[in-house]
UniProtKB/Swiss-Prot annotation:
Residues 124-220 form the VPS28 C-terminal domain. Component of the ESCRT-I complex, a regulator of vesicular trafficking process. One of its GO terms (cellular component) is cytoplasm. This is Vacuolar protein sorting-associated protein 28 homolog. It comes from Homo sapiens (Human).
């Protein structure tokens, strides 16, 4: 029935236009792809920070868990924003307007540059938690970026050790203290211009990552 009657494309159908089925790429080269990847990372960090703020307001996370997570996100935000900052994007406000990113809680955290749990006093527990998280990430990021000279690593590592000592809630036998202490001893035997070799960098990253995870487990306990 109805044999020989050609099929007629519906209204708006592509018909015989194969180009309409081709994949549309946002980028033309590797540099453009990296640019869009960097913007996507920044977008994701801001959205995650907004979700974390809402979770804290709803009492879904403890103050210590929130402080650690927010501190890490603030460090990630700074790194992500540096990758997109330029002639097209000069500020985070401009980025949010351009991509219709409505995250007022995250923007407040970014502008204050600290978790909401942190007060101005230096002895505040949450301030110590935030500093420990930030220093762990800072040292590990330096190593990943092949910054390995003794005088570039030791100051942050020493500050990390001192900050952990100020946390009276942290057990005296906390494994992270032992890890940091051992690496400080290693660095103290080096001259300022000496650099860690590849094997030492790999081991130090592994040790610090383990210590950082142990610190997070302590906060969640």
């Amino acid at each position: 029935m109805f044999h020989g009657i050609p099929a007629t494309p519906g209204i708006g159908a592509p018909g015989n236009k194969p180009e309409l089925y081709e994949e549309v790429k946002l980028y033309k080269n590797a540099r453009e792809r990296e640019k869009y990847d960097n913007m996507a990372e920044l977008f994701a960090v801001v959205k995650t920070m907004q979700a974390l703020e809402k979770a804290y307001i709803k009492d879904c996370v403890s103050p210590s868990e929130y402080t650690a997570a927010c501190s890490r996100l603030l460090v990630q935000y700074k790194a992500a924003f540096r990758q997109v900052q330029g002639s097209e994007i000069s500020s985070i406000d401009e980025f949010c307007r351009k991509f219709r990113l409505d995250c007022p809680l995250a923007m407040e955290r970014i502008k204050e540059d600290r978790p909401i749990t942190i007060k101005d006093d230096k002895g505040n527990l949450n301030r110590c938690i935030a500093d420990v998280v930030s220093l762990f990430i800072t040292v590990m990021d330096k190593l990943r970026l092949e910054i390995r000279a003794m005088d570039e690593i030791q100051p942050d590592l020493r500050e990390l050790m001192e900050t952990m000592h100020r946390m009276s809630h942290l057990p005296p036998d906390f494994e992270g203290r032992q890890t940091v202490s051992q690496w400080l001893q290693t660095l103290s035997g080096m001259s300022a211009s000496d650099e860690l070799d590849d094997s030492q960098v790999r081991q130090m990253l592994f040790d610090l990552e383990s210590a950082y995870n142990a610190f997070n487990r302590f906060l969640h306990a």
